[in-house]
Amino acid sequence: MGIKVVATNKVAYHNYNIIETYEAGIVLKGSEVKSIREGSVNLRDSFVRIDNGEAFIYNMYIAPYKPASKLQHDPYRKRKLLLHKREILKLMGKVQEKGLTIIPTKVYLKNGKVKIEIALAKGKAKYEKREAIKERDMKRELSKKYKGKIKL
C-alpha cells in the first residue's frame, strides 16, 4: 500500500529546530481512524508529554466523524503513543537535560495503519525566525530574477 501523508505541522518547522524524528503508532477509536482517513486532523499547537513512562499527545484535533451519529469522540482528548521503552527513556532523558521538547510533525497512513512522526526539537528565538524568512525571500527574489539561468 505504501505511505499516504494525511497532515503535516508546517508551523513546527518555522518555530523549532528539528533534531531527531521518531515514528510512533497511536491508540485511536474507530471514528477517529475514519476521520484521519478523510484528512480531518490538525497538529497545530499539539505537543507530546511523557507521563509515568508512557508517551501521550495533547491538543491534537481530530474532527468528529459525521456519519457516526451517537458514538462521537472528544476531538482534543489525549491519545497514547506507541513507542518502544528504550525510545521513551531516550526521549525522557533528552527532554529533561537540554530543555528540548517533543512535537508531532506528520500524521500518515503506512500499510493501512495510522502513524505519527514526532520530533525532538529546540525552540527558535525570534531573530532566528526572522533570518529564515529573509533568507527564503532572498532565494525567491533571485529565482524570479534569474529564472532559468542559474540553479540555486
From Swiss-Prot:
Keywords: Cytoplasm, RNA-binding. Disulfide bonds: none annotated. Its main location: cytoplasm. It is found in: Cytoplasm. GO terms for biological process: trans-translation. GO terms for molecular function: RNA binding. One of its GO terms (cellular component) is cytosol. Pfam families: SmpB. The keyword Cytoplasm applies. Required for rescue of stalled ribosomes mediated by trans-translation. Binds to transfer-messenger RNA (tmRNA), required for stable association of tmRNA with ribosomes. tmRNA and SmpB together mimic tRNA shape, replacing the anticodon stem-loop with SmpB. tmRNA is encoded by the ssrA gene; the 2 termini fold to resemble tRNA(Ala) and it encodes a 'tag peptide', a short internal open reading frame. During trans-translation Ala-aminoacylated tmRNA acts like a tRNA, entering the A-site of stalled ribosomes, displacing the stalled mRNA. Belongs to the SmpB family. This is SsrA-binding protein. It comes from Persephonella marina (strain DSM 14350 / EX-H1). The lineage of its organism: Bacteria, Pseudomonadati, Aquificota, Aquificia, Aquificales.
